[in-house]
């Protein structure tokens, strides 16, 4: 216990040190749900006012369709506009199964329904779909037609058992891929949720699964994703990779730790001949590490893998694997993004195997003889051209795989540290999608990060040197009004659209909305959005061309001074002057909110025609993110205030406020409800407009004025003579005239 306590304290110290050294960045632009809708760059869809647990399970860009699974429904939506009327199939669980589910004590709302979790393209005309079936999984073939114009969408086969293809519990994730009309699934195969398996079904060959109840293979896994990735030029060497997290017991067998893992199998694996019959003989797994390392050495791990995105390149070895990780500690909560080179993953799987002498021993690198062909090699591939099937593998290869499925080395991210870390925030990342964008000054990987509060952050990470990174949150969007956590996310670079789901509905968001950054070249340049550039008239979508000088863009530095010459930068820096009044000894607020929270603010004060001087901040004068708070206003506070914003060394005047101080005694007379004043009706004779004074009043004073005006209107409506409203004009006039020498502009006209 003492050792665990020390580890927890060390972890907290490492994370707090990391946060202290790296302040959490803010989004440069934040759009609420309503503001996002006003940009006309988003669409929203919901089948019902009730939560239906939507999951985007398949994208077909060739037919412009997106297939969504939900509770009792399968949807086909137009990816050009998801708000259009969808094609849908109502596919509930049978009444008998629903009743049995309820009798078993399962949740009637979130468990006893048919939650669709598998949608895979079986062939050109049919989808293969599976649902939880009220804790009795079912599957069927769904006819979608040969073309999207056919408007065909119906289940045209009898339902069959989904056991081994879809989890019983809809709250337990199911992952799957379809290869040559064979389904590869990661799920739980039983009602109680104790038998996890990676399973191949729908096959003309024998069904194959992981070794049952063997914790060396799978230990209470929670599946995250699955992908088919080529391995070299021979198609027989391609492998299916499963990403998951699992609970592993330590040597003391008293506690369980969560580790993120990646496993792989060969699609053409048919199991062993005498051992591992109908079991994978090519199953290997390795640990995925995403951690922060302190200068003194200790690592703080983000243990729980939440989502995976593969950014594919022309060469599969250069594919980038992005992962969302969260902490499992109850002491601190956070999330991180780690990115891995696929070549590093291959290196680990080609490296040493892990070995354990006994239950109380540590893992070591296996030092014995490695059988041939190397365990994990696919039959018929580049290294085993003469072996047509895994049943031809020697017995020692099969035995070795059964006892040594784990690789000794762990897989570390690029530069052995996270790309992005979030600790101490009120949200955690849940989903990720990445787009590769060509800009004027290079190529950037733009990250779209979904959160558990229903927002999407658009982030670009800029390289500064071989190891350091500088991240920019370009924008954060509320894609769901009720802040529902994001459950799935798909991206279409072809359509330049992002598709997001939650328990409540579906959202479609454009990857860019350049016009929101502003109407000036400097605004566009400061945004540093790889999708956007200044075209000489507006901030618009950037398209790489040979004429670079006609498009102004600087993602790496965002410097308007070099990019916006000739676009009247001097005029852009000047803000319109406004007049604001404050009452002596009261509190006032000078508002100045920059467009970007990433800008630093400086306040300058100019009195009469003197030079501008920086405002000295103290307990009385306080700078906030929204402006300058002046407590107990003094005569010396009067003058012209300049609010200067600096971003990327570019300075601009956000606000000019001509601040005038009013005497508290004068304002007291004006607002005395027992001394109503008639001279205020002579607006043209006043040296200032009454509305100007109103801006200086506190909330309580404004309430008094509002009540006075209400009483005045009522008396006028009753036809009373205006003579009864005269009030103590003489007292006010005397008070102001006594201050003529100090400020003659406050003198009222003679009556």
Curated annotation (Swiss-Prot):
This protein's UniProt keywords: Developmental protein, Differentiation, Disulfide bond, Glycoprotein, Immunoglobulin domain, Neurogenesis, Secreted, Signal
InterPro entries: Ig-like_dom, Ig-like_dom_sf, Ig-like_fold, Ig_I-set, Ig_sub, PSI, Semap_dom, Semap_dom_sf
Signal peptide: 1-21
Chain segments carrying region Disordered: 712-751
A Gene Ontology biological process term: semaphorin-plexin signaling pathway
Subcellular location: Secreted
CDD domains: Ig_Sema3, Sema_3C
Single GO MF descriptor: chemorepellent activity
Pfam families: I-set, Sema
Domain (Ig-like C2-type) ranges: 571-655
Glycosylation sites: 81, 123, 268, 465, 585-586
UniProt keyword annotation of Secreted present: yes
Domain of life, source organism: Eukaryota
Basic and acidic residues biased stretches: 712-731
Domain annotation Sema: ranges: 28-511
Chief location category: secreted
Cystine bridges: 101-112, 130-139, 266-378, 290-338, 514-532, 592-643
Any GO CC annotation of this UniProt entry: extracellular space
Described purpose of this protein according to its UniProt entry: Binds to plexin family members and plays an important role in the regulation of developmental processes. Required for normal cardiovascular development during embryogenesis. Functions as attractant for growing axons, and thereby plays an important role in axon growth and axon guidance.
Subunit structure of this chain's protein: Interacts with PLXND1.
Family in the record: Belongs to the semaphorin family.
PANTHER family noted in UniProt: SEMAPHORIN, SEMAPHORIN-3C
Name of the molecule in the record: Semaphorin-3C
UniProt source species: Bos taurus (Bovine)
């Amino acid at each position: 216990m003492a050792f665990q306590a020390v580890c927890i304290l060390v972890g907290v110290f490492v994370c707090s040190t990391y946060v202290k050294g790296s302040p959490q960045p803010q989004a440069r632009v934040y759009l609420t749900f309503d503001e996002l809708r006003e940009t006309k760059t988003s669409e929203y869809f919901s089948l019902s006012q009730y939560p239906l647990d939507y999951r985007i399970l398949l994208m077909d860009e060739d037919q412009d369709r997106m297939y969504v699974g939900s509770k009792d429904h399968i949807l086909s939506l137009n990816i050009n506009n998801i708000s259009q009327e969808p094609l849908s199939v109502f596919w509930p669980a049978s009444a008998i199964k629903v009743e049995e589910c309820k009798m078993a004590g399962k949740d009637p709302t979130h468990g006893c329904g048919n939650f669709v979790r598998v949608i895979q393209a079986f062939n050109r005309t049919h989808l293969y779909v599976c649902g939880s079936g009220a804790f009795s999984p079912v599957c069927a073939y769904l006819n979608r037609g040969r073309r999207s114009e056919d408007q065909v969408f119906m289940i045209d086969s009898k339902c069959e058992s989904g056991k081994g293809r879809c989890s019983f519990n809809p709250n337990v994730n199911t992952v799957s891929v379809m290869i040559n009309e064979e389904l590869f699934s990661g799920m739980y195969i039983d009602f109680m949720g104790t038998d996890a398996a990676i399973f191949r079904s729908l096959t003309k060959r024998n069904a194959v699964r992981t070794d049952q109840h063997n914790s060396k293979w799978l230990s209470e896994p929670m599946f995250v994703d699955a992908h088919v990735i080529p391995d070299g030029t021979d198609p027989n060497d391609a492998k299916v990779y499963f990403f998951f997290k699992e609970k592993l017991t330590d040597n003391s067998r008293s506690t369980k730790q969560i580790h993120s893992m990646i496993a792989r199998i060969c699609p053409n694996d048919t199991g062993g001949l005498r051992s591992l019959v109908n079991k994978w003989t090519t199953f290997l797994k390795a640990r995925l590490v995403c951690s922060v390392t302190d200068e003194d050495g200790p690592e703080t791990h983000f243990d729980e893998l939440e989502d995976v995105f593969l950014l594919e390149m022309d060469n599969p070895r250069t594919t980038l694997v992005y992962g969302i990780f969260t902490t499992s500690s109850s002491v601190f909560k956070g999330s991180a993004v780690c990115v891995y080179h696929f070549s590093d993953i291959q290196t680990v799987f080609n490296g040493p195997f892990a070995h354990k002498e006994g239950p109380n021993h540590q893992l070591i690198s296996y030092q014995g003889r490695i059988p041939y062909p190397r365990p994990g090699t696919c039959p018929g591939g580049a290294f085993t051209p003469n072996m047509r099937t895994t049943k031809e593998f020697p017995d020692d290869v099969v035995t070795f795989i059964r006892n040594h499925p784990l690789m000794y080395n762990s897989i570390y991210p690029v530069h052995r540290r996270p790309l992005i870390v979030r600790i101490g925030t009120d949200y955690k990342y849940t989903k990720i999608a990445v787009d590769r964008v060509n800009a004027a000054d290079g190529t950037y990987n733009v990250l779209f990060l979904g959160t558990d509060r229903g927002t999407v952050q658009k982030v670009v990470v800029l390289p500064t040197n071989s190891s350091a990174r500088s991240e920019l949150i370009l924008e954060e969007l509320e894609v769901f009004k009720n802040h529902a956590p994001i459950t799935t996310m798909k991206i279409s670079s072809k359509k330049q659209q992002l598709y997001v789901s939650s328990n409540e509905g579906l959202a479609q968001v454009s990857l860019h909305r350049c016009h929101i950054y502003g109407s000036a070249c400097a605004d566009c340049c400061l945004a540093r959005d790889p999708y956007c550039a200044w075209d000489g008239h507006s901030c618009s979508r950037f398209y790489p061309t040979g004429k670079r000088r006609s498009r102004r863009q600087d993602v790496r530095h965002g410097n308007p001074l070099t990019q916006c010459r000739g676009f009247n930068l001097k005029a852009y820096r000047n803000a319109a002057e406004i007049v604001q009044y404050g009452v002596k000894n009261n509190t006032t607020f000078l508002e100045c909110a920059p467009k970007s929270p990433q800008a630093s603010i400086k306040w300058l004060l100019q009195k009469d025609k003197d030079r501008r001087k920086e405002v000295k901040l103290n307990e009385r004068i306080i700078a906030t993110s929204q402006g300058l708070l002046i407590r107990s206003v003094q005569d010396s506070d009067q003058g012209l205030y300049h609010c200067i914003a600096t971003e990327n060394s570019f300075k601009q005047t956000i606000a000019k406020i001509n601040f005038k101080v009013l005497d508290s005694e004068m304002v007291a007379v004006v607002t005395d409800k027992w001394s109503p004043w008639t001279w205020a009706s002579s607006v043209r004779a006043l040296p200032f407009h009454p509305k100007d004074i109103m801006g200086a009043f506190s909330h309580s004073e404004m309430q008094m004025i509002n009540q006075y005006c209400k009483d005045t209107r009522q008396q006028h409506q009753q036809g009373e003579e205006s003579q009864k409203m005269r009030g103590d004009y003489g007292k006010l006039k005397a008070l102001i005239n006594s201050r003529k020498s100090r400020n003659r502009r406050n003198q009222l006209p003679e009556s």
